[in-house]
């Protein structure tokens, strides 16, 4: 089988396509939640904390000198990204929980009893013969 044919079979499998759709939707969902956090939630948190903009929080290790920029640790941006992650994770958790509740449990048909092996069949025949 040629390399191209193998790749084509791999690419058109349902799981790969489902995963690709999930990645695209997840990316769009991430942008929505990032906007929710950055544009709606964090301004409210900033007002509640006295007008603090978390993305501006930083520790300056070395001041700017001439054309050289200052060396900083931008921990405020880390706080912002962490809050984004927590909200995204919580939203995904709620979505999965809702989907699982909407799914109807599949009715499981009772399994047919397993067919006895040869030894059991032979013993049953002997028993039946002894009853006669």
From Swiss-Prot:
One of its GO terms (cellular component) is plasma membrane. It is a multi-pass membrane protein. The gene is mscL. Channel that opens in response to stretch forces in the membrane lipid bilayer. May participate in the regulation of osmotic pressure changes within the cell. This is Large-conductance mechanosensitive channel. It is found in: Cell inner membrane. PROSITE patterns: MSCL. The chain crosses the membrane at residues 10-30, 76-96. It holds the Pfam family MscL. Belongs to the MscL family. The lineage of its organism: Bacteria, Pseudomonadati, Campylobacterota, Epsilonproteobacteria, Campylobacterales. Keywords: Cell inner membrane, Cell membrane, Ion channel, Ion transport, Membrane, Transmembrane, Transmembrane helix, Transport. Homopentamer. GO terms for molecular function: mechanosensitive monoatomic ion channel activity.
């Amino acid at each position: 089988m040629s390399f191209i044919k193998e790749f084509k079979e791999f690419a058109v499998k349902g799981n790969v396509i489902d995963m690709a759709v999930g990645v695209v939707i997840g990316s769009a969902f991430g942008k929505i939640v990032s906007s929710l956090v950055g544009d709606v939630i964090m301004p409210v948190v900033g007002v509640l904390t006295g007008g603090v903009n978390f993305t501006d929080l930083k520790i300056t290790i070395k001041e700017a000198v001439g054309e050289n920029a200052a060396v900083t640790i931008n921990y405020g941006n880390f706080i912002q990204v962490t809050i984004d992650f927590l909200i995204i994770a919580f939203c995904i958790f709620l979505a999965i929980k809702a989907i699982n509740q909407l799914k109807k449990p599949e009715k499981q048909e009772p399994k047919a009893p397993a067919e006895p092996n040869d030894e059991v069949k032979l013993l049953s025949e002997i028993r039946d013969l002894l009853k006669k």
